């Protein structure tokens, strides 16, 4: 840079080390691997980066035509004409009219059946496996619901007593009392539970619902039999029923000396039959007081007299 003033042109070609930095490198005599120019204080000499080696990657497969389309192939749905719409509208109106007619017919029949005293009894109890009809809250008058609920409790109490009786007799059979008493206990349960429902509970339910005097008489007849059975089972003397087939006080006393556990079971059965007897006596007392106080007794006598007169003629 010696001999050059500060006013000289740095891009002017000349001899020595004065080089135009923008001149073609091929016209210079420098080597291909080095830079043939110097750029002064603001230029740095850098080597050009070499090209990356060629890779042998297989090309990607072509994308399907609907790759970026989230919708499936469109389906051509023919639009209904106005004639088809009118036809369907007429069909719907005809079906609606038919349903309204059937609904009115069913309602008319239900009202006629209700006026005649006929009530459809759908099975609704127990809720998990309906086997009987029992809707005290909706069908029984409010002033009679308490008595009906207690009567239903006495029905459930009888079922519980007979089921516990099977357990106790099974324990006695295991201890050597023989299979005969077990079969008798099963027979008591199979006949007693549905018999109690059909012979006295359902007549009482219908009598409370419709206030029928004859149904009250049917209830009194078989409910007295029910009370007599409960009292007999609580005592359980060996007169009518065989041996220890009922969990009464007498079998409990005879078993407590030989097998304590079986004796305790029989004493529990004795207590359950006693409670069932007391509850049943309360129910029949309440029903009888209502029966006499509401005039159903005189009505039943009149109906019985009319029935006897019709039978005589």
UniProtKB/Swiss-Prot annotation:
<dbReference type="GO" id="GO:0055038">
    <property type="term" value="C:recycling endosome membrane"/>
</dbReference>
<dbReference type="InterPro" id="IPR007273">
    <property type="entry name" value="SCAMP"/>
</dbReference>
<dbReference type="GO" id="GO:0030658">
    <property type="term" value="C:transport vesicle membrane"/>
</dbReference>
<keyword id="KW-1003">Cell membrane</keyword>
<keyword id="KW-0968">Cytoplasmic vesicle</keyword>
<feature type="transmembrane region" description="Helical">
    <location>
        <begin position="149"/>
        <end position="169"/>
    </location>
</feature>
<keyword id="KW-0472">Membrane</keyword>
<keyword id="KW-0175">Coiled coil</keyword>
<keyword id="KW-0813">Transport</keyword>
<feature type="transmembrane region" description="Helical">
    <location>
        <begin position="255"/>
        <end position="275"/>
    </location>
</feature>
<keyword id="KW-1133">Transmembrane helix</keyword>
<feature type="transmembrane region" description="Helical">
    <location>
        <begin position="216"/>
        <end position="236"/>
    </location>
</feature>
<feature type="coiled-coil region">
    <location>
        <begin position="85"/>
        <end position="116"/>
    </location>
</feature>
<dbReference type="GO" id="GO:0015031">
    <property type="term" value="P:protein transport"/>
</dbReference>
<feature type="region of interest" description="Disordered">
    <location>
        <begin position="1"/>
        <end position="69"/>
    </location>
</feature>
<dbReference type="GO" id="GO:0032588">
    <property type="term" value="C:trans-Golgi network membrane"/>
</dbReference>
<comment type="similarity">
    <text>Belongs to the SCAMP family.</text>
</comment>
<feature type="topological domain" description="Cytoplasmic">
    <location>
        <begin position="276"/>
        <end position="313"/>
    </location>
</feature>
<feature type="topological domain" description="Cytoplasmic">
    <location>
        <begin position="1"/>
        <end position="148"/>
    </location>
</feature>
<dbReference type="Pfam" id="PF04144">
    <property type="entry name" value="SCAMP"/>
</dbReference>
<protein>
    <recommendedName>
        <fullName>Secretory carrier-associated membrane protein 4</fullName>
    </recommendedName>
</protein>
<comment type="function">
    <text>Probably involved in membrane trafficking.</text>
</comment>
<keyword id="KW-0812">Transmembrane</keyword>
<dbReference type="GO" id="GO:0005886">
    <property type="term" value="C:plasma membrane"/>
</dbReference>
<feature type="transmembrane region" description="Helical">
    <location>
        <begin position="181"/>
        <end position="201"/>
    </location>
</feature>
